[in-house]
Amino acid sequence: MGFDLYGIKPKIKKGSYKPPVLDWNKSTEAEKKKYFELSNQYEADNVGVYFRNNVWGWRPLADLVCKLCDHLTDKQKSFLQSNDGYEYSEATALKIADTLEAFVKSPQAKRTEQEHKKAMKKADAHNKKVNNKLDALRMDAIAITNNKDIAPRDYPKDLKDKWDRIYAEHDHTASYPFALKNVKEFIKFLRECGGFTVC
């Protein structure tokens, strides 16, 4: 699961062509493999066609755009966090690219990346402690029920309530990486996409 951004009017290099879609039911594995190779090459040659991030990588990038891009409306900011197919114009894409480019060139960019890595490391250490508590609680549930395969939803009520409280202590910062490399790739896409949709 993730976020797929498609260029509306991407710049296409001369001589570049998109492979025709295959009939998956009638194609051999070799034909499918070749199709993916050609599709990947087409997207690499034409960076404005497609940009993808898994949900974990997209959230920090979209948050950065929302934080820095005062020119975006609340609606535009909101739809960055949704894959409903909202469209952003070419002018908007270029403004976002300019804003992110200025950020990347600033000392703040490296600091942001380093601070995010520290926060992830701290959250990861915290989550290990939370997971240890959950593991201990699981042993209690097994001892009471004599069911070594018991899932938390089937714990006795008092243990299930305790599991819910402990699980809520997880710090999800550990799950959302931020990398300047990703920001730079997004800038390339924005400059070449001719406007984009978020799906």
Indicate where each model-derived feature is located.
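Acidic (Asp/Glu-rich) sequence patches and key acidic residues
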Residues: M1-C199
